[in-house]
Amino acid sequence: ASYDPKRGEGKYDTVELGATLDQALATKGEEAAGVKCTSCHKMTDEKLVGPGWKGVTERRTPQWIMNFITNPDPMIDKDPEVQAQLEICLVRMPNQGLSDDDARGILEYMRKNDGVK
């Protein structure tokens, strides 16, 4: 199967998003991100170790984000845009072993950060 740059690679074919933000889910995601993500990622567009998260939900589909944060290794190997980021950041994102619930919460936290109300 060929690599789909809109979907990524992993178990998520679609991710249902509410029209409005799920505040409780975003709060859980913020907690998970604080443990697993924010040592390398800022919530702005500034690079820390990895790229900043600002605008990611506008650039990427929900399923791409969910697949990437739960299954980064094959996507780093196959996605040309991720490979370009790797040349800038120089560090491969390690698999953080996120649960489905944590990954979905982190996606909601990213949506909140990008201004979804």
Where are these regions (language model features)?
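Electrostatic cytochrome c docking/interface patches
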Residues: 1-33
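Sequence context of c-type cytochrome heme-c attachment sites
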Residues: 13-16, 42, 83-85
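Short coil/turn linker and secondary-structure boundary residues
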Residues: 21-24, 60, 98-101
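Short pre-active-site segment immediately N-terminal to redox-active cysteine/selenocysteine motifs
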Residues: 25, 33-36, 44, 92, ...
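Gly/Gly-Pro-rich "capping" loops immediately C-terminal to redox-active cysteine motifs
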Residues: 26, 30, 42-71
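Sec-exported extracytoplasmic/periplasmic mature domains
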Residues: 34, 38, 42-45, 58, ...
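Axial heme c-ligation environment in periplasmic c-type cytochrome domains
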Residues: 48-56, 73-102
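C-terminal capping alpha-helices of c-type cytochrome domains
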Residues: 63-68, 91-117
